[in-house]
């Protein structure tokens, strides 16, 4: 299966200007045998925030980052050894607000189909998951939860090849799929939280 990446290139993203912390992620899209794949990282178990969870390469904005896009590219280089000139940034998705007070800016990028090297300090492993696996209805579920500070929220789960993508990363995947494919989440609450 394939995404219509032109939709991401033409999209005018909504930005969240008022969060205390800025962060960015790179959504690496790989083309292999005519199908699209997404590259995820599994966070190292010793990390203080979100240990063992699946994520896209990314992190907090540093003072030396000239832009939030540069943050995404720097973090991808640090976490998976992707050189900035290897990434063809196609577009930007809506910012999402996390319960840890970050405004996360996702960037969609075509990247080469090659082996990537995880930074063992932050990344336990790299997983390249097929779009067809992500879109398989048997691999998706959601639940509504009551959050003590934010009220009713919907949590999206994508379970593919033994990996579970959920939380903020799950929200970003939902946004990407709804923009670039005909897939729609069965239920959604837009509270900008993940």
Located regions from the model:
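N-terminal leader/linker segments that precede catalytic domains of diphosphate-processing enzymes
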Residues: 1-55, 60-115, 123, 151-194
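NUDIX/MutT-family hydrolases
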Residues: 119-161
């Amino acid at each position: 299966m394939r995404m219509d990446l032109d939709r991401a290139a033409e999209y005018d993203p909504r930005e969240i200007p008022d969060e205390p912390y800025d962060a960015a992620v790179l959504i690496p899209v790989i083309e292999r045998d005519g199908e699209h794949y997404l590259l995820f990282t599994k966070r190292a178990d010793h990390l203080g925030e979100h240990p063992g969870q699946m994520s896209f390469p990314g992190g907090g904005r540093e003072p030396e980052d000239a832009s939030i896009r540069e943050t995404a590219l720097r973090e991808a280089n640090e976490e998976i050894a992707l050189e900035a000139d290897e990434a063809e940034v196609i577009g930007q998705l809506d910012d999402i607000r996390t319960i840890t007070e970050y405004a996360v800016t996702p960037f969609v990028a075509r990247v080469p189909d090659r082996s990537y090297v995880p930074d063992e300090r932050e990344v336990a492993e790299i997983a390249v998951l097929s779009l067809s696996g992500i879109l398989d209805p048997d691999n998706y579920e959601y639940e509504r939860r009551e959050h003590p500070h934010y009220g009713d929220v919907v949590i999206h789960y994508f379970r593919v090849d033994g990996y579970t993508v959920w939380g903020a990363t799950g929200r970003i995947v939902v946004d990407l799929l709804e923009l670039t494919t005909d897939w729609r989440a069965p239920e959604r609450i837009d509270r900008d939280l993940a």
